[in-house]
Design a protein with these regions (language model features):
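Intrinsically disordered, polybasic Lys/Arg-rich low-complexity tracts
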Residues: 3-56
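Eukaryotic low-complexity, Ser/Thr/Pro- and acidic-rich intrinsically disordered regulatory regions
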Residues: 11-21, 39, 48, 58-61, ...
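Catalytic cores of glycan-processing enzymes that make or break glycosidic bonds
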Residues: 21, 39-41, 51, 165-193, ...
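A short, polar/charged loop/turn motif at coil->beta-strand junctions and beta-hairpin connectors
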Residues: 58, 72, 90, 188, ...
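A short, amphipathic beta-strand motif
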Residues: 60-66, 191-198
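Residues in well-ordered beta-strands of folded domains
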Residues: 65, 79, 97, 122, ...
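Aromatic-rich carbohydrate-binding modules that target alpha-glucans
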Residues: 69-114, 124-145, 200-248, 256-278, ...
């Protein structure tokens, strides 16, 4: 199994983020010549500190020394929550001084009674950008230091080190063996304290230390010095009195058996070396970062399923939070360690099935009422009322798919019925605590729901007295003395019970060694609480979407407003930080939907309907001079307006071209333009919404859409006819077809430069302004959905930040490959054969016979003609391929797991698909075709699958 290559060598800066150099690994300690501190391949753990003068009584002088090899133009700073370190502000951080090519240092004098503080190092590059070393474990408590001088020798923690993933909450709290911390180290009689991290030791193993001095047992592996586990899992420490030691000292960490002390192995890489000078009233802390040990040995498997898709025997026609524990029981039985779900935020905008789309939340914080378990809310007091729903519950639960409207109506009607007698819970201390912690979103959300129903629309622009959010007005509306109080407070009630039920499900999962992975949508619904509260945070004049691809040839228009990142940055991304904190209530890990949106977002003007009319924002436009410099005569009208002549009309409409001309004006030279009242796709859509719906009108409507998008360039905002963005897929337009070949070639070169070269550094800078700050807010494990048209800078940024990528076999990121093999996945990644936006393995198998045949022969290594249907053994082979991937996580849709069994799987694979991205009006209603309880009874299948999981090392 591959291991991330690291050594004890100094980290060297790499723009934009520094990472360690690779060194030859060795388990054998290297002998250290007594008087040769710079010998050969033995790197200095620290440069020899300069002499310090005695400090005042009651004062502690701290000298920070960081091992880091900078490049020209780079400088280092210390930032922390102490006043002398800038109180966490990068602008006020303490500048470090260059000591030699291998280290930087800084000094501060503080009161010995000062409270403990945390700190990190900042690297400032020549371009002014900052990179912060990772982690939250650099802490100093002055009250524990007995001397007057403290030397702190630190190692830079590159965010992309694999080990950092094991210090996120899911690993610290659930997935890794928890050790009992040793007593705090006493420094009264010690001079040097060594700290190091090793997260993946086995339960019977401990970290140990040996070195070149007699006090470190002279490399004697029969006498390893066992270290003590720290308060944080995977942290190890040991303290020595090295007053009589002979410096420099070479040393290494290793592994030994805890019970017997038997030495097992040394860490990889070269010796660590400590250069120090003993002095009176001085203590030294050595923070060595990570022990250089295998760091890719932990791998897990999980299941991905929307909550609404979970079917249980006692369900109400839809999966609920209360059903998650039932699924957890099955997942544990087969050896899975993760349950991944889709967004569970409230999407109730219209009270119709259109609200089934889980990525169009009316609140980025509120939970969806559809996941409420009525039996738990009813309790004993309302059991009779609940029992009256039995017939309706049975009927809904028997359905193949979710009846969204019927389920929602039944649940809301029942809650309204019992609310009057149950609302006393709102006076409880527990609710008051919950309300105080969540008021910032809960109060506006509840008022929003009331006003939505009162006015019959969630478009707050149509609420005369409340179109602009005003907190004082909302507090008055929601006051207990208000006539609207009950209609508002019922939403407090629902949210509180949803909160309790989801937390209970999470606690059950954790108790069974399973983590819950959530999903953060990239956008917000246009008429949402968030847009109502803070419209300045969004570009309401744009719609977010995605450019055309094989799955949506016209692109995707999600309808969400795009983010005003500049405005969000003014308060340090406070809204995003609140959003991440809310996720932390319930989830251990989360998937950032469309992480590419943090680099740039596909922005579509409001006058457009199809995604193909968009362009990336931000993006560096093409200046008119660039056309001229390439010898392209710039014809503004020809390039930026729809190109329409008789041949184009025939190509688009065929024999209906004469019918289409009623929407056009004839111009000179055999060309046409759209009439002013049909100049935009939105105008065309509105017109055809009021005419007879038939095939001819549908064809004309789509044809007019195609004419409107038949352009080569879009003028940039405020471009003043000087700056332009290329229309995506320019070569496929009819406008391009009828250009001269010479112009075509020149435009193609400029097009390639625009999309695939000039933007990379710019987009990287955009992402680095956002993602590091947001990642630092939470200690959850973060995965990015990095699919689609991926800029070249994305993999580097995600790797440097330690964000897990998503790797899909049939969607290779290398355009030269037809398929991606799971065995080629990076360690920090999630591999999966399909997602909710795709057909399942079985569905895909039947879509394109030529691709299926190629996959069958090349990826599965089979001879002959591929079976027409994806037989169970084929599905099984694909699942096993993914289980044996080196990726940290292998996650499967339940449909793909069941697809391994010819007996258990659904007959029609197309009925298993959750979403069709090309259809903006898709009904999200997929349900399991058998209950989880039934699945639990399939012993042979479960044992077989569990065997594959175990054999793969997951």
């Amino acid at each position: 199994m591959a291991t991330e290559k690291r050594s004890n060598d100094l980290p060297k800066a790499k723009k934009p983020i520094g990472k360690g150099r690779t060194a030859r690994a060795t388990n054998k300690p290297v002998a250290l010549p007594a008087n040769n501190p710079t010998n050969g391949k033995t790197p200095a753990a620290t440069a020899k500190p300069a002499k310090t003068t005695s400090n005042a009584k009651g004062q502690l002088r701290i000298r920070f020394q960081l091992r880091y090899r900078t490049s020209f133009g780079q400088t280092l700073f210390i930032t922390g929550n102490h006043p002398q370190l800038g109180k966490g502000s990068a602008d006020q951080a303490l500048a470090m001084k260059y000591f030699n090519e291998e280290s930087w240092y800084a000094e501060i004098d503080i009161d010995t009674a000062s409270p403990a503080f945390t700190y990190n190092y900042l690297l400032k590059s020549a371009d002014g950008s900052f990179t912060t070393d990772w982690g939250r474990d650099k802490t100093i408590d002055p009250t524990t230091i007995t001397g007057k001088d403290l030397l702190v020798l630190d190692a830079w923690n590159y965010a992309g080190y694999f080990e950092n993933a094991f210090y996120t909450e899911p690993f610290e709290q659930v997935l890794l063996h928890q050790r009992k911390a040793a007593k705090a180290i006493s420094r009264k009689t010690t001079t040097h304290t060594f700290h190091v991290k090793a997260p993946l030791l086995q339960p019977h193993e401990s970290l140990c230390l040996l070195g070149s001095d007699a006090l470190l047992h002279d490399w004697d592996t029969t006498q390893p010095i066992l270290m003590e586990p720290g308060a944080v899992n995977g942290h190890w420490s040991i303290a020595f009195n090295l007053n009589k030691a002979q410096f420099p000292i070479a040393y290494k960490y290793g592994i030994a058996e805890t019970a017997t002390g038997k030495f097992i192995r040394f860490e990889d890489g070269n010796n660590r070396v400590l250069y120090d000078a003993v002095a009176k009233d001085k203590q030294t802390i050595i923070n060595d970062g990570f022990a250089v040990l295998p760091n890719t040995s932990w791998r897990g498997a999980g299941i991905a399923i929307p909550v609404f898709s979970i079917r249980t025997a006692k369900g109400f026609g839809v999966g609920e939070f209360a059903d998650i524990p039932v699924l957890v029981d099955w997942a544990k039985h087969v050896g899975l360690k993760l349950v991944q779900i889709l967004p569970v935020n409230d999407t109730t905008a219209t009270h119709t099935w259109m609200d089934s789309y889980p990525y169009a939340a009316i609140s980025a914080f509120a939970l969806h009422p559809i996941y409420l378990n009525l039996e738990q809310v009813a309790g004993k007091q309302h059991k009779k009322a609940y029992d009256k729903l039995a017939a309706q519950q049975t009927a809904l639960n028997a359905l193949d798919a979710v009846d969204y409207e019927a389920v929602m109506k039944a649940k809301l009607d029942f809650v309204k019925k019992i609310f009057a007698s149950e609302k006393t819970v709102l006076s409880s201390d527990d609710f008051k605590t919950y309300y105080a912690q969540n008021k910032h979103w809960l109060l506006p959300y509840a008022a929003f729901c009331y006003l939505r129903d009162e006015y019959g629309t969630c478009d707050f622009n149509q609420w005369p007295a409340y179109r602009h959010f005003n907190l004082a007005d909302i507090e008055a509306l929601a006051a207990e003395t208000s006539a609207a109080y009950d209609a508002i407070a019922i939403h407090f009630f629902i949210q509180y019970h949803l909160h309790l039920q989801l937390q209970q499900a999470v606690a059950y999962a954790h108790a069974n060694g399973i983590i819950l992975k959530g999903d953060i949508p990239i956008g917000i619904y246009r008429y949402s609480v968030d847009a109502w509260q803070q419209p300045e945070l969004y570009h309401m004049e744009y719609q977010a979407g995605a450019p055309p691809d094989d799955f949506a040839v016209k692109g995707q228009n999600w309808g969400f407003p795009t983010y005003n990142w500049a405005k969000m940055q003014e308060d340090g991304f406070a809204w995003w930080k609140q959003r991440f904190e809310q996720m932390r209530y319930y989830f251990d890990a989360f998937r950032i939907d469309h992480i590419l949106g943090f680099f740039r977002i596909w922005s579509i003007p409001m006058h457009a309907v199809e995604g193909i009319m968009g362009h990336f924002v931000p993006a560096l436009p093409v200046h008119i001079n660039e056309f001229n410099s390439r010898g392209i005569y710039f014809d503004y009208h020809r390039y930026t307006q729809p190109f329409i002549n008789d041949q184009v009309l025939w190509d688009v409409f065929g024999y209906d071209n004469e019918t289409a001309k009623q929407y056009l004006d004839y111009n000179a030279f055999g060309q046409y333009s759209l009439k002013p009242e049909f100049a935009t796709q939105r105008q065309v859509e509105n017109h055809f919404a009021g005419v007879e719906q038939n095939d001819v009108n549908a064809k004309i409507k789509q044809g007019l859409f195609d004419l409107i998008s038949n352009v080569l360039l879009f003028e940039a905002k405020d471009g003043k006819a000087q700056q332009f963005h290329f229309r995506f897929g320019m070569e496929g337009t009819l406008s391009f077809r009828y250009l001269d070949d010479g112009v075509k070639n020149q435009l193609k070169d400029l097009y390639v430069d625009y999309f695939f070269r000039r933007q990379d550094d710019f987009w990287q800078q955009q992402a680095l302004q956002k993602l590091p700050a947001l990642k630092r807010v939470t200690n959850m494990l973060i995965c990015g959905e990095d699919l689609g048209l991926v800029p070249a800078c994305v993999p580097d940024v995600m790797r440097d930040l330690g964000l897990l990528s998503l790797e899909i076999q049939r969607m290779p990121k290398d355009p030269k490959r037809t398929f991606f093999h799971p065995n080629d996945a990076p360690y920090l990644s999630v591999v999966t054969p399909s997602t909710h936006d795709m057909s399942t393995i079985r569905g895909w198998w039947e879509e394109d016979r030529s691709k299926t045949q190629e996959f069958y022969n090349k990826e599965l290594g089979q001879w002959g003609e591929a079976p027409y249907y994806c037989e169970g053994w084929i599905n099984k082979a694909i699942v096993i391929q993914h289980l044996y991937s080196p990726a940290m996580w292998s996650i499967f849709q339940l449909q793909d797991i069941l697809g391994m069994s010819d007996a258990l799987r659904r007959q029609d694979p197309n009925a298993e698909r959750i979403n069709v991205p090309a259809n903006p009006k898709h009904y999200w209603r997929y349900r399991m075709h058998l209950s989880v309880e039934q699945l639990m009874q399939e012993k042979a299948f479960n044992d077989e699958f569990a065997g594959y999981v175990k054999a793969s090392g997951r």
